Amino acid sequence: SMFAYITVANPIFVGHFGIQEQIFGLIFGLNSLGLMITSIVNAKLERKFAPISLLKFGLVMMIICAGFTWFLGKISGLVGFEIALFFTIATNGFIIPTTTLLAMKRHAKFSGTASAILGFLQFSVAGFVSFMVSKFAVLTPWALGASMMICAKIGATLFLVLIFKRCEI
């Protein structure tokens, strides 16, 4: 969902909403700040909660927030859409570092190889998502919200099928 946002954020904010490039830069930075804050909170919470629990929380919140992004993208203006989008982007602070931690923990002996494979997979999926949102001209707020929700649901499904059954809670 992150690369769907990165790919079409400028055309949506500048083209659809008609904001100035400088304001877009501030909004993009604000959304990045939300991601950084939740990453810091996630790191602190990993001392008290199992990483798998934080990942479940992040995935559920991503689906909920992306749903609000889609819904508000259909019915509201810039402010409502941006608030929902901010929280959708911020939930990645629970997902991205935690999936990396779990992958590295499971393959500690081969951490370098595991890291390389994980990076390759992440950027391959990101490239595919970027291609798809570009190909299908996802240039409206509701379409971005829908794309992010689809990505979140696919991620949650993969988590349930591939990871959840093997992890101790």
What are these regions (language model features)?
Residues 38-52:
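Helix-to-loop junctions at the C-terminal end of transmembrane segments
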